[in-house]
């Protein structure tokens, strides 16, 4: 098993991509901490995985809570080997329609949270002197601007840049930092995304989702199962010589 006895802390892991990663990491032998603001759902998800998983409540916008959770995990499990910054929110508005409230919320969750998670966890990794792996979740939205997705695109572009800077700063401590940029991923959140598009583009419910799926060269949305294999690879020793990269998992939407 590629992650045997590793300790993995995953934010936003009660559902969706984060939960898929938690399940995959546990199957590879890791001890998994499902950190999510929705503690009830996180607890249910951890119980379904079994004794290899533990749920903790975490609001990534609360810096004191970040420090407390990281400290508690470090003390209970004897370190943290893997961090996945997955917690994020979506927002939709053109530049002339954004609000200060939306700006602060998107960047607090999508950028500030991951930045300070990296700070707290990397300091634990450095203190334990056994290296580690950090995986940040970017997006195809961070590769290019989209007229109606101003704040989300900007926050995910910033994650790609932050990944590169963190990677260069932490490599001397044996810590590899990389990112994954998924394309369109099916899940509960698409009901919200579809509703946003219906509002801004005057579409019927479900119309945008169908059009987006059709536009993907592979011809469908991704699922967490399409992404988890790359996450396991980046969390394992197989990726020891990979640094500061952002991997597209988008069905061919973005070619590099």
UniProtKB/Swiss-Prot annotation:
Transit peptide keyword on record: no
Domain of life: Bacteria
Gene deletion effect: Deletion mutant cannot grow on D-galactitol. Does not exhibit a growth defect when grown on D-altritol.
Catalyses which reaction(s): galactitol + NAD(+) = keto-D-tagatose + NADH + H(+); keto-D-fructose + NADH + H(+) = D-sorbitol + NAD(+)
UniProt record, GO biological process: galactitol metabolic process
GO MF terms, alphabetically ordered: galactitol 2-dehydrogenase activity; L-iditol 2-dehydrogenase (NAD+) activity
Pathway entry: Carbohydrate metabolism
Annotated protein name in UniProt: Galactitol 2-dehydrogenase
NAD in keyword set: yes
Annotated source species: Agrobacterium fabrum (strain C58 / ATCC 33970)
Entry similarity comment: Belongs to the short-chain dehydrogenases/reductases (SDR) family.
InterPro entries assigned to the protein according to its UniProt record, in alphabetical order: NAD(P)-bd_dom_sf, SDR_fam
Function: Involved in galactitol catabolism. Catalyzes the oxidation of galactitol to D-tagatose. Can also catalyze the oxidation of D-sorbitol to D-fructose.
Active site positions: 152 (proton acceptor)
């Amino acid at each position: 098993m590629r992650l045997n006895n590793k300790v993995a802390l995953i934010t936003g892991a009660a559902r969706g991509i984060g939960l898929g990663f938690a399940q995959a990491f546990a199957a590879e032998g890791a001890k998994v901490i499902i950190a999510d603001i929705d503690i009830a759902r996180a607890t249910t998800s951890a119980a379904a995985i079994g004794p290899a998983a533990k749920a903790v409540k975490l609001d990534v916008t609360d810096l004191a809570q970040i420090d407390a959770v990281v400290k508690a995990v470090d003390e209970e499990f004897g370190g943290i080997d893997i961090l996945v910054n997955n917690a994020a929110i979506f927002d939709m508005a053109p530049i002339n329609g954004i609000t200060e409230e939306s700006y602060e919320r998107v960047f607090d969750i999508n950028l500030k949270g991951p930045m300070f998670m990296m700070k707290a966890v990397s300091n634990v990794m450095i203190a334990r002197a056994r290296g580690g792996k950090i995986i940040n979740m970017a997006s195809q939205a961070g590769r290019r601007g989209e007229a109606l997705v101003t704040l989300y695109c900007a926050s995910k572009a910033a994650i790609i840049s932050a990944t590169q800077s963190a990677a260069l700063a932490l490599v001397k401590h044996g810590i590899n930092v990389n990112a994954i940029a998924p394309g369109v991923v099916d899940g509960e959140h698409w009901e919200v995304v579809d509703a946003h598009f219906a509002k801004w583009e005057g579409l019927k419910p479900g119309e945008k989702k169908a059009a987006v799926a059709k536009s993907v060269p592979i011809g469908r949305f991704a699922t967490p199962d399409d992404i988890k294999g790359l996450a396991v690879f980046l969390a394992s020793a197989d990726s020891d010589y990979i640094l500061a990269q952002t991997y597209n998992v988008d069905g061919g939407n973005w070619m590099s």
